[in-house]
């Protein structure tokens, strides 16, 4: 183990080296101190990696293991033995160039910016990853079966411990309390089952469609291959079946709570901030997040983070209202719609040389790039493009961008 690469919540990612051939890997360590729920969530990520492998734009796991921590116990009731805390280890490829957030940070430090052509080419790769998820077809693979077996075994152990604790608890309850607890146990159904990835494929035959949404697209979850040309989408712990119909208020609250935990706020779609009964959460959440990601690569932060900082208002209110701007646009701007080049230059320069400057200089980002972002950031999911339409929009954008507009990117030189 060489060094810590990153951390968040109960997970840590380390740079590790194979002693036999000196190969470098990323080792993700996920502490699971809360029994079945946290173990199942961690192994859900393991299973998600196997669904799409091999895909050039989606990270794959090399190996994984579940380890009991004999020194730590989950607190039980009475004198019943309780299950040991577990740690899930996931071995992943290591990418020395880091992720798009590293590129954004480098640009901010060095006062440079992302070349629009290079960004759009990378976004095409991300769209290919999303297409594999949004248009996934069921298949049977040995690796997925193995991941499910490990998940079922770990969940079974924790379920046994939970039953032991429940029996111990009942022994301390009165008859009336025990009867009420039995009724509660019978009525209680999981709103969002931990094995929802597996259950989503029940009744499906190999070849049948079964869409999934990533639900946490952001610059930090898009790695760059060692050649700097291929984006790799990572962190599949937030993966969820799509569409997800919201049929009750309790389910709406559950989905909203899960989004608050697993979907990064500045990149989270508005329908996940305020989940309504009768609505449907689908793959369009990823299109919104990808629009925020493109904006962040071009400007340095999420559009709603930027707007919230500018106005001092709530980020969530900005998201729900679709309130964002390109730098330099006034409050009457049409929700980030790209102005014409000449009009923008005239308003900025305000002198007789403005038209000449407009011919020699162009606005950044290019109007074609702005239009792609604007199409993604529609508050109504139905008004956003699907992944195929977005790929067409990006292709059109690339055809309009100057060939020499690569921009200076310090991350490309790492």
Feature locations, PLM:
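Protein kinase glycine-rich loop
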Residues: 2-8, 13
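Glycine-rich ATP phosphate-binding loop
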Residues: 12-32
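Activation segment/activation loop of eukaryotic-type protein kinase catalytic domains
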Residues: 167, 174, 182-185, 193-197, ...
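Terminal C-lobe "cap" of eukaryotic-type protein kinase domains
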Residues: 379-404
């Amino acid at each position: 183990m060489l060094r810590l690469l990153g951390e968040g919540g109960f997970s840590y990612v380390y740079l590790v080296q194979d002693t036999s051939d000196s190969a470098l890997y990323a080792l993700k360590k996920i502490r699971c101190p809360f029994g079945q729920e946290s173990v199942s969530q961690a192994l859900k990520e393991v299973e998600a990696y196997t669904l799409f492998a091999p895909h050039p734009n989606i990270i794959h796991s090399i190996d994984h293991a579940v380890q009991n921590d004999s020194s730590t116990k989950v607190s039980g009731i009475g004198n019943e033995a309780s299950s040991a805390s577990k740690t899930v280890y996931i071995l992943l490829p290591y990418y020395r160039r880091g992720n798009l957030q590293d590129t954004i940070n480098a640009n901010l430090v060095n006062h440079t910016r992302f070349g629009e052509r290079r960004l759009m080419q990378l976004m095409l790769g991300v769209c290919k990853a999303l297409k594999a998820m949004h248009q996934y077809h069921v298949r049977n693979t040995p690796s997925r079966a193995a991941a499910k077996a490990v998940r079922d075994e770990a969940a079974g152990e924790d379920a046994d411990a939970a039953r032991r604790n429940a029996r111990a608890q009942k022994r301390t309850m009165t008859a009336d309390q025990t009867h009420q607890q039995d009724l509660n146990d019978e009525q209680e159904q999981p709103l969002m089952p931990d094995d929802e990835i597996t259950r989503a494929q029940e009744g499906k035959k190999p070849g049948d469609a079964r869409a999934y949404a990533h639900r946490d697209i952001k610059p930090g979850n898009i790695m760059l291959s060692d050649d700097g040309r291929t984006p790799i989408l990572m962190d599949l712990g937030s993966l969820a079946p799509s569409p997800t119909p919201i049929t009750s208020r309790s389910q709406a609250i559950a989905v909203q709570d899960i989004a608050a935990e697993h979907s990064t706020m500045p990149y989270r779609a508005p329908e996940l901030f305020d989940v309504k009964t009768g609505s449907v959460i689908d793959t369009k959440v990823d299109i919104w997040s990808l629009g925020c990601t493109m904006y962040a690569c071009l400007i340095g932060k999420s559009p709603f983070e930027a707007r919230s900082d500018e106005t001092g208002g709530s980020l969530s209110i900005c998201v729900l209202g679709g309130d964002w701007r390109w730098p330099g646009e006034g409050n009457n701007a049409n929700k980030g719609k790209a102005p014409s080049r000449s009009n923008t230059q005239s308003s900025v320069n305000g002198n007789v040389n403005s038209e000449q400057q407009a011919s020699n200089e162009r606005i950044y980002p290019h109007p074609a790039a702005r239009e792609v972002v604007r199409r993604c950031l529609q508050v109504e999911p139905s008004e956003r493009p699907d992944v195929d339409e977005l790929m067409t929009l990006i292709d059109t954008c690339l055809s309009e961008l100057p060939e020499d507009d690569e921009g200076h990117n310090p991350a490309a030189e790492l």
